[in-house]
Amino acid sequence: MSRFFVSGYTSDSSSEEEDLLSTSEEELLSSSDEGEDNESDSSFFGEDDDESEESSSDDEDGRPSGPAYFLKKSFLKGAGGDDSDSDSDDEGRKVVKSAKDKLLDDMKSSIEIINSNKYNNNWSIVLGEFDKFGRFLIRCNQTNLGTPKFYIKLLTSLDNSITETSNNERDDKTLKADEARAFNTLRQRIKKQIREFQVYYDLYKENPEEFDENEDEPLESVQAGLNDNVKNEADNSNVGALASNRVLSPIFHTLKTISESRGKKNIDKLEQIATLEKLLEANVSKSSPFELISIYQMLLSVRFDASSNQAFMPLEQWQKNEQDLGKLLDLLEANVDTYQVSELGSTTDDIDIEPVANAQGVKVIFGSITSSIDRLDDELTKSLQHTDPHSTEYVERLKDESTIYNLIVRGQAYVESITPEDVKYKSEQLARIVLRRLEHIYYKPKQLIKANEEEAWRNIEYNSSIVSKGSSVDEVIDQLTEFLQKQQKNKTYGKHAILFSIYYYAVNSQYEKAKELFLRSQFYSNINSAESSLQVQYNRALVQLGLSAFRAGSIEESHKILNEIVNSQRSKELLGQGFNSKFPNQATVLERQKLLPFHQHINLELLECVFMTCSLLIEIPTLAAIANNHKDSKRKNASLKSFKSKLDFHDRQFFTGPPESIKDHIVHASIALQKGDWLKSYNLLSSIKIWKLFPDNDKLLAMMKNQLQIEGLRTYIFTYKSVFKKLSIEKLQQIFQLSKDEVVSILEKMITTGNVSGGEIIDNKFISFTSTTEPQRSKLQELAIVLNEKIQLLTEKNEKTQSNGYGKKQQNKDQQNQQQQNQNQNQQQQQNQQQQQQQQSSQQQSNNILSEESANKFRYANVNSNNDEFQATA
C-alpha cells in the first residue's frame, strides 16, 4: 500500500517517513521528469518541521485533509490554484535532498570540522568527529553506498598532521594531558584504518588525481580503473602486486582474515580450524599447489595455536595434524620441481603472491617442515608426560611413537633433497631433524631399531646420502653422529650425538666401544659449564656405561662409575626423571617439560641393585682382609664404611626375618659370602626378580656366579689364613667349584699384589702361609693383644686421675721411656718387612693414583634444577 493512502497524513508523519525512505523510492523521486509533480512533491516533502510554521500554514492556507487530499485544487499548486498562494509558496519552498546526499553532506561537514581543529591541536574534537565519521561510514555500507574516495584523502591528511605533531612534540611538549591522550588514541585508530585500506592509501600516494575526480564515488570505481591499468601495464610488477592484493581470491581472503586475527584475544580458534578444514575440503581437487600449500601451513599452525594454553594437544587434533603433515609432504614431493617449502625461502609482502622462481625454476616458499615435525613430536612427549605410565592409555599413546618416527625419516629425506650439497653441513633445519631422529632410536635395542628403520623406509621414494636405505643399525647410529659432528653452525648437535652413541653402545652390550667413545670425547673436563639438557644426557650415558660395565663383568669399573651418582641423593634430578628436593607441584612448567617420558627412564631400583652388588663383590673380601689385619688402615674408605654400616645395622636387629626387599637380599648374601658360602649368596642374589630387566639375563647370572666363586675364595683365604698353615688347592677347588688353573691363578694374583704376604704355592697342590715373616697369630691371640693394649691405656688413665695429673711424674716418665724403647724394637722388627714391601707399596700407590684419575673421569654432571632455566653450576 502506498504511503500516500494513509489517513491523517501530516507534516510530522512526512518528516518521519523522510528518514525511512528506501533506496528505490529515492531513485523514483529523483528520476521523475514531470515538473508539476516535482514541484508538488517538493512542496510536500520540503515542509519544515518547525511547529510555528506548520500552525501558520494550516491557519492561512486551510490545508485540506482527507483520503484524497492530494487531488484537491488547493493542494495542486500551479495547476489552476491561486497565484498569490503560489508565489508565497515559491518563496518558502526548500530543496529536497536524498538520504545519500544528506549523508555525504554530513560526512563532508565532519571533515571540515576535523580540518579546522587539527591545526589548532584540538585533538579531542578531532577524535570525536572522527568517531562520528566512522558511524557515517557504517551507514554508507548498510545502504550499499560504499566508502567514498574522500575518506582516503582524510586518512592521508590526518596521518600527515599526526606525523608533524609527533615531530614537534619530541622537542616541545605543548599538548595538554587530555589532548595528548586523544592524540594518541587517534593515532592508533588512523594507523589501523590505513592498514585496512592500505592498497588505496598507497594508490592515493602514487596518483592523487584519481581521487580528486568524482570524490563522492565509492572506492570500487578506483579499483575498476586500477584493474584496467594493470591489464595495459603488465610489466609493472609493483602495480601488479597491488592489483593481486586488491582482488583476493576466496581462499586467500579467508587465509588473510585468519592470519590477521592470530594472537588477538577472544578469537574462537576451533571455529578457525573448522573454516580451514572446509576450505581445504572444497578446494583440494581444483586449487593450485601454491594455494594448497598455503592452506596446509595455516591449518597446521592454527591447530598448534589452539592447544598452546593446554597441557598437551588433544589426541584428535594431533592425529589430524599428523595426517595433514603427511598430505603436505605428498603434495611437496609431487611438485618438487616447481614448489619447495624451506627455511631458506623468502617471504612476500602479501599472502597471495608467489615467490620468484630461482635459477632452476623452483619457487621456494618460506616455511619449515622440520619445525612442524618438532612441534608434533613435542606434543606427543607432553602427552606422555601427563599420562599415567602404568595405565593402558600410556601404552596406546606410545604406539604413535613409531608413526612420528616414520614422519621424521620422511621429513629428513625431503629436507635433504631440497638442501644444496654445498650448504648441507650449514643447514640448521637438516641438523635439527637428524638430531630428532637420533633421539628416537638411541635408547632402543638393535632389534627394535631395525624394525623401525624397515617400516620407515617402506614408502619413501628418496634415498639419503647421510644414511642410505638398508644400512645396519650400527651404521645408522655412526653415520647420523658423524653428520652432526660436522655441523659448522651449532657444535651442540655433535655433542648430543656423541652422548647418544655412547648410550646406544652401552645399552647394546658393547662396553669397550662405549668406554672408548666416552674417554675420547673428554666431556668430563667441562661438562659442568654445559647446558642442562646436555648435562642430563651426559649423566644418562654415564649411568648406562656403568650398567654395561657390570654386565661385561668389569665390577670395579662399574662401581667407580656408579658410586657418586647413586650416593648423591639427587639421582632423579641428575637423570631428568623427577625431583628429589621438591614436591611435584612445586616444579615449574619449564622444569617439568625438561623431564623425560617414562619409557625412557633408567630404573633406579635396578641401578641401586647393581651398585650394591658391585659393593658386595668388592668390599666383602676387603672387610675380611681388614678384619684379619687390623694394622692395615690403608684399605679403609668411605664406601667401606657405608656398606659395613648396613651389615652392622642388620647384626643389631633382635629378630631378622627372611629377605623381602632388594636390600635385604643383598645384605643376606653378603653375610653368607663372609662365611664362604658362595652358593647361598648366589641363590639369594639370583632370586631378585629385577635382573630380568636386562635382555641377557642368563649371561648376567652366569657372570655373577663366577664372580661370587672368585670373591668367595678370596674372602675364605683372608679369613682363615691366620688359622691354617697350609690349604689344599684341591679342597678349595671342591668348595668353590672352580677349576684347578683358576684357583691357582687367583692365589698367585693375591700373592703378587701383596694381599697374602709371604704365601707360597707348593707344586700347585698346596698354598703355604708359613713362609711369611708376619707373626702367625690366631684370632684369640689377636684379641688378647688388643685387650692388653686397652688395659694398659686404662691403667695409665686411672693413675693420672688418682694423682690429679701431678703425682708420679717420674714414674710416668719412666713408663714413657719404656714404651719408647718397645716402639723402637717393634720398628726394627718391622724394618725388614717394610723393605720387602716397598716395591709393592710403590706399585700400589701408582695404581691408586691411576684409579683416582680414572674415577675423576666418571664424575657426574651437577644439574641445578632450582630455577626455571635448569642451569648448571660449576
Swiss-Prot record:
Gene Ontology terms, MF aspect: RNA binding; translation initiation factor activity; translation initiation factor binding
Keywords linked to the UniProt accession: Cytoplasm, Initiation factor, Protein biosynthesis
GO cellular component: cytoplasmic stress granule; eukaryotic 43S preinitiation complex; eukaryotic 48S preinitiation complex; eukaryotic translation initiation factor 3 complex; eukaryotic translation initiation factor 3 complex, eIF3e; eukaryotic translation initiation factor 3 complex, eIF3m; multi-eIF complex
Major location (coarse): cytoplasm
Region ranges (Disordered): 1-70, 797-874
UniProt biased composition (Polar residues): 862-874
Pfam families: eIF-3c_N, PCI
Low complexity bias spans: 813-848
GO terms, biological process: formation of cytoplasmic translation initiation complex; translational initiation
Compartments in which it is found: Cytoplasm
Residue ranges with Acidic residues bias: 14-61
SMART domains from the UniProt entry: PINT
Coiled coil ranges: none
Domain PCI: 598-774
InterPro entries membership: EIF3C, EIF3C_N_dom, PCI_dom
Superkingdom of the organism of origin: Eukaryota
Family: Belongs to the eIF-3 subunit C family.
Subunit structure comment from the entry: Component of the eukaryotic translation initiation factor 3 (eIF-3) complex.
Protein's job: Component of the eukaryotic translation initiation factor 3 (eIF-3) complex, which is involved in protein synthesis of a specialized repertoire of mRNAs and, together with other initiation factors, stimulates binding of mRNA and methionyl-tRNAi to the 40S ribosome. The eIF-3 complex specifically targets and initiates translation of a subset of mRNAs involved in cell proliferation.
PANTHER family xrefs: EUKARYOTIC TRANSLATION INITATION FACTOR 3, SUBUNIT 8 EIF3S8 -RELATED, EUKARYOTIC TRANSLATION INITIATION FACTOR 3 SUBUNIT C-RELATED
Protein name: Eukaryotic translation initiation factor 3 subunit C
